[in-house]
């Protein structure tokens, strides 16, 4: 069986852990049942959850059995954040989000075979527990002093907002999840982000006190860029995995923009490429950075992992059509709309408005005289076809799927025309 810890360390996917040699021995001894939890606090998972899904997949490929926990109960409580109380959502909203997360998670794991994954929901055991049961059977094993010393709890208590008893109690519920999964599924390992370390160790302590058994946890580091800032924000916000919240095209473009200083490290973290493949791409970054081979490989791999091969091909076709000279008419309406969603746009009338009007309306030129000059010199195109007539009028044949047309000035100034 693969020494999975060495692989995770090489990829930069291992931060804190319980006793390393004991954990290594435990994993090498045979299939281990492990779990990672995902709370439905939003309609979609994001790139941070993707790191955890990738770790789960690595462990499964090494022969271990994943339990993917959707927090139908803990999602109604909310893990304490660095600042500010979470807004509690209704039971119906949390259930809807939990269903969506269930669907997203299921794409990353195999649910058949000797290391088959299992989906679980902590609402199944938490909703059956009364307040008295929780306090008598679980709460008595927790010491308030230890709970107060957890990093985020301590920061929140010291802040003006403080922390509610609801969020303060979250760590008890998470620890109980580990205990329940140990009892129900023989689960002996929890994985998660480094910000969850304190809660995860709480589960290890609880199982030791209640069952007299040693279990394990390991965390991934918080992903940062080479300059030390946190990784994972686009102009539109978080890097969502749901295509309804971030289109596959925008998702691909985000990864394509990763800096040279970060791309090799991110290839290790976010893809399943071999050491040899990544080392070859590292040479490309060092010797031919302008070709951006590593960024293209990263963007393609992560997009295919999250959205599938068909969506990747659509994204590549759209990218080629917009920036590589491909045929824009090959794009269907949905792909074209997604690829042009963030471009500037103007509404114009077929048969009345000219290409010069469009250049002015978009702010590409200050006036019609300059616009006509640009057109005459071959500096403007409609749908990747150069326009040279300075009096050219927008025509029916210029209309693409969805009533759109693309206009370009030079190489970099690209915009959308909404034609009617």
Segments from the language model and where they lie:
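NTP-dependent nucleotidyl-transfer catalytic core
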Residues: 1-196, 201-204, 211-216, 229
